[in-house]
Amino acid sequence: MAMAELESVIEKRLIDQLCCDESQWTYRPDIRTEEQLWDNFKYILEQNNKAKLNDIPLSESEFAKIKNDLSHASFYDAGKWLIGENGRVYVHVQRGNETLHLVVMNNEHIAGGTSVYEVINQYQAFYSKEEEGSRDRRFDVSLLINGIPLIHIELKNKEHSYMDGFRQIKKYIAEGKFHGIFSNVQMFVVSNVVDTKYFAAARDTELNKKFISGWLDKENLPVCDYIDFAKAVLKIPEAHEMVAKYTVLDNDKKKLLILRPYQIHAIEAMREASKKGKSGFIWHTTGSGKTMTSYKATRNLLMDIPSIDK
């Protein structure tokens, strides 16, 4: 019991940090089930698309179609959808003779506009008859953007390795717990308080510890403590940018990749320089992901500064 209480304290401390003024997250203790999660998503979707819906709520059949569209076969498929069109992620609903193009997320509205940032914990991932050998699970902390869980966090106390969190996530994926709206998760975070890592979402058979990355600050110093990690990576706009700007689709292997800290810092430095009209270059050693860095740097600059000559 003492260990369980300790981990609940760890969880609360993280939520408190995420919801402090500068982080922009709102804690939603009222969302614990799949039904509550879908209801919350529906409310946000309707609020952000009032004009297109003509203030008429989505019907049961319309929303059933949306729920089906958001229930992906893989995290990679979710990633393809989340790329969107010119920074906007849509769902499409047929209403009479008209097709409504509803904006789920606008990645041009990071840290403002129509973006809604919420934190949930102890989500109940229930047992399903289709999941042989499975049982009910409770997720630690999940971060929702416009009602969709995009980042999931598993926490351990100091008596455990962060790898226990990694293995736990792998087990949950194998059991099919990341289904429905949770199939949209793009990034996982695991921590034992003093050692914190992140990695891209993948099938359980594709999760490999070699893709786990720690965070480094701009001075190349490791950020290990989970609260320090939350301050550096999980506040807004950083968390939204991790899934919207620094996640890459590997279309050959059909999997997600998330940039490593040095790649992200390089892209951010180039972005800041471009805003000031300065030039420069990114230097990477052999095998450090130059192609991926250059691709994401170019894509992000085009999104930030539309006037750049393509």
Task: Set out the residue ranges of the language-model regions.
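ATP-dependent helicase/translocase motor core
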Residues: 2-309
